[in-house]
Amino acid sequence: MTSLTLSSVLRRRSCVFCLWLILTPGAQGRAECRADALGTSRVLAVDPTATPRVGRKQFPATLPLGTREVVLTFDDGPWPGTTPHVLDALRSECVKATFFVLGSNVVAHPDLLRRELSEGHTVAHHTWSHRLLNRTSLAAAQAEIDRGIAAVDDVLYGKHEAKPVTPFFRFPGFASSPALLDRLAYRRIVVFGADLWASDWKPMSPDAELRLVLKRLEQARGGIVLFHDTKRQTAAMLPAFLRALKVRGFRVVHVIPREPPQP
């Protein structure tokens, strides 16, 4: 039998450790971060009891963020023509974001959803088909919400339950109702509004969107920012936006549920 020297054992253990680094998404991401990358400054665990509804554009309160802290959120994806470019830009700057996804797009593009999760982003919920829920019956609205949640959790975890793995939700068009807000609070699902947005649903160039969102961000001095990863101009301007955050001294905060996910 071949004897093993201490040096050979160490070499083998070193190789195993290197393989672990290669196969672990989080470790791989850290290894690839540039020294001058924007990065994610901290992680904020959101408590549904303390902050059941956040975003000053819709609600009285927002997340407990410091001056020049931002939370990046993207709605309506995943979409093959644009979401990969958004993910590439975030990965290049080692930034984590939150994606409020549509169940219909999740079913059509499951690999993109899996990529969002594997790269460390928070995957949250935005209904099945983007219906404005204040224009339909309470039962139909709840079914629209639950169908979207089920699509996400089935793709990512192989099953779904009444409470989503990530209990974050945003109403399409911010079209909520008191009854739906109460139902979501009862289920301990945090409802996200926004503190500002890029207005990227309007036709504009990437440069125009960049100027607009930076102006609003400077005026607000931080907050929850709403983009759409389905918009080409947003995907195109995002690298410059992230670099501008770095230059202007903004810091990115990554939001996660306070209660650990139970897939």
Located regions from the model:
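Alpha-helical scaffold elements lining the catalytic groove of polysaccharide deacetylases
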Residues: T82, R131-G158, A175-R221, T234-M237
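Short secondary-structure boundary segments
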Residues: D195-L196, H228-D229, I256-P257
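Active-site beta->alpha N-cap acidic-glycine motif
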Residues: L38-A140, E144-Y157, P164-T166, K231, ...
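Bacterial N-terminal signal peptides that target proteins for export
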Residues: T2-C15
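Boundary at the C-terminal end of the N-terminal hydrophobic targeting segment
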Residues: A27-A35
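Bacterial N-terminal signal peptides
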Residues: V16-P25
